[in-house]
UniProtKB/Swiss-Prot annotation:
One of its GO terms (molecular function) is triphosphoric monoester hydrolase activity. Belongs to the dGTPase family. Type 2 subfamily. It comes from the Bacteria. Residues 75-190 form the HD domain. This is Deoxyguanosinetriphosphate triphosphohydrolase-like protein. SUPFAM superfamilies: HD-domain/PDEase-like. It comes from Clostridium perfringens (strain ATCC 13124 / DSM 756 / JCM 1290 / NCIMB 6125 / NCTC 8237 / Type A). Keywords: Hydrolase.
Length: 342
């Protein structure tokens, strides 16, 4: 008997009945022979970790653009924190930890440079709009491995696609594991963005709404602990009542929504970042404008996409994959005069 088969048997013994068992995966777009020692979701996790798109997350902004402090979150650090929170919830619920890990690690593969500013600019440029969750799926299916894609399982792709959205009535993933990642993403970014905002000096602990802090906790670790435990216990109640969904309780969920709104009003869309947002918008817009007119200068993969799916699509895929630094360097290379020695 192969090691993988032993793991799959152990899943049957260990995991909750609502978990997604590895040997019941709906498979991949391209048929593959099963691995001898890894389940299909372990294979997906490893492919994501070793992908170029995953490595580039270390140079993509989470909130604060071009921060030079060593402790601000990048998109990669955010991804790792989401994975940790999601796995904690998943293990407590006896779900498939490998599926959770793969979805969490892949959920932001398609995120543009300059945080959500980049997403907004590309959304205006691409006919039909741009959403980072959809782009993450496209990266996994089409862009990675020079156009071959990672050939991930359908469950992982579904979890990546449906990790966005906040309310309990939003479109959700088809697995409990995917639903867990959706909540873990919010739990992670709301709390670590508060931490980074305090570190940047644009927010103080006492600025946080007192009525929310009394419910969720005064520190980041307290809030994460409150939210994780509430998600676990409320989801267990849902399962016991025959309601197969991951959710927060009404009280905790409402407080969390208010805290998230506070961040949007005061940080994400606040005045402190306004000048940096305008600079990022200008840089990204000019890079898009240049490659739209000169798409033949892009790498071969993206030129092929332009020919097959249109210039807007090819330019979007190329620019969406850029890191903050790469995009800025492209802008400088295209528009900034070089010094000439006479």
């Amino acid at each position: 008997m192969k090691i993988r088969e032993n793991i799959e048997i152990f899943e049957r013994i260990k995991l909750n009945k609502v978990a997604k068992f590895s040997d019941e995966s709906r498979g991949r777009e391209r048929l593959e022979e099963p691995d001898e020692i890894r389940t299909c979701f372990m294979v997906d996790r490893d492919r994501i970790i070793h992908s170029k798109s995953f490595r580039r997350l270390k140079r993509k902004t989470q909130v604060f653009i071009r921060t030079y402090g060593d402790h601000y979150r990048t998109r990669l650090v955010h991804t790792l924190e989401v994975s940790q929170v999601a796995r904690t919830i998943g293990v407590a619920l006896s779900l498939n930890e490998y599926l959770i890990e793969a979805i969490a690690l892949g959920h932001d593969l398609g995120h543009a440079a300059f945080a959500h500013i980049g997403e907004d600019i590309l959304n205006d440029f691409l006919p039909g709009g741009f959403k980072h969750n959809e782009q993450s799926v496209r990266v996994a299916k089409k862009i990675e491995k020079n156009g071959l894609g990672l050939n991930l399982t359908k469950e992982v792709l579904d979890g990546i696609l449906n990790h966005s959205g906040f309310s309990n009535v939003s479109k959700v993933a088809g697995t409990f594991e995917g639903q867990v990642v959706r909540f873990a993403d919010k739990i992670a970014y709301v709390n670590h963005d508060i931490d980074d905002s305090i570190r940047a000096g644009i927010l103080k602990e006492e600025d946080l709404p007192k009525n929310i802090i009394e419910i969720l906790g005064a520190s980041g670790s307290e809030r994460i602990d409150t939210l994780v435990k509430d998600c676990v216990f409320n989801t267990i109640d849902n399962i016991d009542k025959g309601e197969p969904r991951v959710s927060l309780s009404n009280e905790i969920g409402d407080a969390f929504i208010q805290l998230r709104k506070f961040l949007f009003d005061n940080i994400y869309l606040g005045k402190y970042l306004e000048d940096e947002r305008k600079k990022a918008e200008f840089v990204l817009s000019k890079v898009i404008e240049y490659y739209y007119k000169n798409w033949g200068e892009m790498p071969e993969l993206y030129k092929n996409i332009c020919e097959e799916e249109g210039i807007h699509r090819g330019v979007t895929d190329y620019v969406a994959g850029m890191t903050d630094d790469y995009c800025t360097n492209e802008f400088n290379k295209i528009y900034i005069p070089k010094f000439v020695m006479y």
